Amino acid sequence: MKPNIHPEYRTVVFHDTSIDEYFKIGSTIKTDREIELDGVTYPYVTIDVSSKSHPFYTGKLRTVASEGNVARFTQRFGRFVSTKKGA
């Protein structure tokens, strides 16, 4: 491997702001912010969604009340479409 071309791999603290949870993960992300956890200073990155807060991973999927495209079309324009063949 060539020297001095790879980014620095280090432990970074990611803060999921939606659930106020902190994760220490190895990463090469660059940041100017720092935070002190457990007496150690780490690079710090805020995120909006993580696997702990995303509905897909938590199992708290919200139900979508909208219908499919065909059902919406039929509802809006169904009265104009003839149900008889050849008409």
Swiss-Prot record:
Coiled coil: none
GO biological process: translation
Keyword annotations of the record: Ribonucleoprotein, Ribosomal protein
PROSITE patterns found in the cross-reference section: RIBOSOMAL_L31 (PS01143)
GO cellular component, one term: ribosome
Record bears the keyword Ribosomal protein: yes
InterPro entries, sorted: Ribosomal_bL28/bL31-like_sf, Ribosomal_bL31, Ribosomal_bL31_B, Ribosomal_bL31_sf
GO molecular function term, any single one: structural constituent of ribosome
NCBIfam families associated with the record: L31, PRK01678.1
Subunit note: Part of the 50S ribosomal subunit.
Family of this protein: Belongs to the bacterial ribosomal protein bL31 family. Type B subfamily.
HAMAP family registered for this protein in UniProt: Ribosomal_bL31_2
Protein name, as recorded: Large ribosomal subunit protein bL31B
Gene responsible for this protein: rpmE2
